Amino acid sequence: MASTLIPMEQGSRVDMHCHSVASRSTKPDVRKALVFPECATEPEAIYELAKRRGMDFVTITDHDTIDGALRLADRPDFFVSEELTVRFKDEPREVHVLCFGIDPDDHARLQERAGDVEAVAAYVHDRGIVAALAHPFWEVEEPLALRHRRRLAQLFPVWEVRSGYFGTALNAPALAFREACGGVGIAGSDCHGGIHVGLTYTETPRARSPDEFLGHVRAGLAEPHGEQGNRMKLAQATAAIGLRSLPGGLGRVGGALASRAPRVRPRPAPAPTPL
């Protein structure tokens, strides 16, 4: 996967993986043990933070629902997406597939096919939907064998190779495998706590619309950028979810958590035009 060398002042940025209050829990973890929801951030708050952090377009990829994303669907710089839980047919193995720029009919059709990864891949291919394998080396259910990963590389040319939720131990093999097989690498924060939105993102050449941005991704003109995950970020996210779940929400504490998160590196100013 060769670098596209996108000039920073000319690119368009999107955090291609983040969650709102609409997300459903998909796997037991510390949040479930503490009786916390999967996410407690309203879609409008995600949009506002993404824009403050320099994202040109915004999307929300909730687990198996587009209810949160539809609340922002009328905004011209927003596109509806979903993190689809997909199974290998007749096997106890699941993966998550990010489906971008979809509509309610696509959502329904994808849910109907979610029990068969081959059927999902055929649908997104036929519809021209940009779809990416999320966190490829995180085990959603049973571990994947090499044959599964090879097939996934064939079915989904786009992989999430930089996650703001998972660290180098899972991101590095995803990048190496994708480069060995060919294809496109993207990045997203996978933010559940509402404080790391926009700190991990995908950049393409300048796009004038969400459709053009996704067209660049489809064409391989995309670069992953930003933070990777670590224990501190996981602790911050879990605390933020818990605080948002309390009566009155995050309030000042949430603002303090968000203010401690590093900022996206600024775009350099354009060079002055010669006289």
Language-model regions, residue ranges each:
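Active-site flanking residues adjacent to catalytic metal/cofactor-binding acidic residues
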Residues: 16, 61, 82, 134, ...
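Divalent metal-dependent hydrolysis catalytic cores, especially in the metallo-beta-lactamase
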Residues: 33-39, 44-64, 129-132
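Amphipathic coiled-coil/heptad-repeat helices and related helical stalk/stem segments
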Residues: 42-43, 113-117, 144-145, 170-171
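Generic structural signal for well-ordered alpha-helices
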Residues: 47, 66, 118-121
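Internal catalytic-core helix/loop-beta-alpha segment
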Residues: 109-143
